[in-house]
Amino acid sequence: MKRSFLNVFCAVAILAAIILTLAACGGDKKGQTTAAFDAENAFSRLLSEVKYAETLSDTSSSADFMFSDLPQNAEIKMYTCESGSHPDELIMMKGAKEEDVQALETAAKTHLTELTAQLRDYNPQEVPRVENAVVCTNGLYVFVCVTDDVETTKAILK
């Protein structure tokens, strides 16, 4: 009983952290990217300026497997740790239209929840990194960044 309560409490805490992150980093509500925001440039900066546990590799070719429920014509770029021993990753999803953004945000939240559950079983010391992931929406774009370098990530996505 005590373990079930702890699992429920942790799940609620994770969801609350994700929701607060989304609220703090949300873009405009009409799905339009602000003129000052260049998503491709932000992605490049996130790759080069943010500190990750190890080198990230382009794993975009496996993104369809991890995100099978994305809206039609959604685009995704995904970089993950080469060895797979750390959860650090950078994901940029782009919806084809404004209505896709909510589905992309849901996919991002679901991905982080599933990643947290996996880590609890085999690498629990990495769970806080995922719980503190930055999820940011700007226009048609949704970014997910799992790293300890949260401040740099937020500054780039601002």
Regions found by a protein language model. Name each.
Residues 20-24:
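C-terminal motif of bacterial Sec signal peptides marking the signal peptidase cleavage site
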Residues 101-138:
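Short Gly/Thr-rich strand-loop-strand
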Residues 82, 125-158:
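A short, solvent-exposed beta-edge/loop patch
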Residues 79-113:
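Mature extracytoplasmic domains of secretory-pathway proteins
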Residues 32-53:
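Post-signal peptide N-terminal segment of mature Sec-exported envelope proteins
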Residues 1-12:
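Bacterial N-terminal signal peptides that target proteins for export
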Residues 55-87, 100:
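Short, compositionally biased low-complexity segments enriched in polar/charged residues
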Residues 26-29:
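Bacterial signal peptide processing site
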